[in-house]
Amino acid sequence: MNRPSRHLVDPQLLSLLDRFPALVLSMDNLPAVREGARQPAPIYAGAEAAAEVVERRIAGPPGAPDVLISLCRPLVTPGPWPCILHMHGGGYVMGAPSADAPQHRVLAAALDCCIVSVDYRLAPETPFPGGIEDCYAALTWIAAQAEALNIDAARLGVMGESAGGGLAAALALLARDRGGPRLAFQHLIYPMIDDRTCVTSAPHPFAGEFLWTPHNNRFGWSALLGETLGGPQVSPYAAAARARDLSGLPPAFISTGALDLFLDEDLDYALRLTRAGVPVELHVYPGGFHAFDFVPEAAVAEQARRDSRDALARALRPPPFCP
């Protein structure tokens, strides 16, 4: 059972809680919430960087519609660029690449990389496996078109926040198991990877009071999985924490807040990856709730953004030359 945790929140993060009302997702308010989730976060509004964003439609999974992707590329450097395949957050039920475009311009220019965002289909209209298959279609398209896109396929990785982090983790599993493109890294920011949280298991008592609550978590997972939620047949490509074998996966960066609903599942996944021989960089931020890193003025949020950017810079570097 959750206990009040406001006294544990970093004081510089309280402004976000005071500015935004508590979100209680339902089928009635989902259309309005989705519209808001398509807008860029205020922290990146008006950001300018030497990068361009172009949209393209690519072939979707067999029998499915085409997939809309956004490509963000530096304007100054000629490439070939390393590439990040990014999946947006939103509990599997909301979100869009448009919300991340300003942030991606900044990152693409700063890291000298190409960022491809996937407008994957959302639940409940498209339950599992529609969304992850859209992302896999984008991954295989990037690998196949790497030369034409001026991308260095040897430096291709996946990234996402929340549900996007869950998709990134699942995509790493799917690419391994299908013999798909080899990934250089998986960059998981407070990833949503275990449907059993708040269903058959409970997080620590101070987790999940703010922003992404147990109610919203159940809403998102139910939309994606329907009646299979919490059951033994849930696929690891829907909930990466369900995977029994984590060997052979790319190096992982995992970050989360100490008050995030996903803390326990993320810590457990990091430990299991480590035990499977996968290099893991793990960060837990005291006083941080879900999506705390969007607070521009908070030192702990600045640190989280810096750690994420620095880890990406390391992951995107060319491999050392060996004569």
Predicted features and spans:
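A glycine/proline-hinged amphipathic helix-loop "lid/cap" segment
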Residues: 1-71, 316-323
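Short beta-strand element of the alpha/beta-hydrolase
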Residues: 80-89
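Short amphipathic alpha-helix adjacent to the substrate-entry channel of hydrolases
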Residues: 98-117
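Alpha/beta-hydrolase active-site loop
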Residues: 126-148, 308
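Gly/Ser-rich "nucleophile elbow"/oxyanion-hole loop immediately N-terminal to the catalytic nucleophile
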Residues: 143-158, 178
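Hydrolase active-site cap/lid region
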Residues: 173-232
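Short beta-strand/loop motif that positions the catalytic acidic residue
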Residues: 254-256
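Catalytic active-site module of serine/aspartate enzymes centered on a nucleophile-bearing elbow/loop
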Residues: 297-323
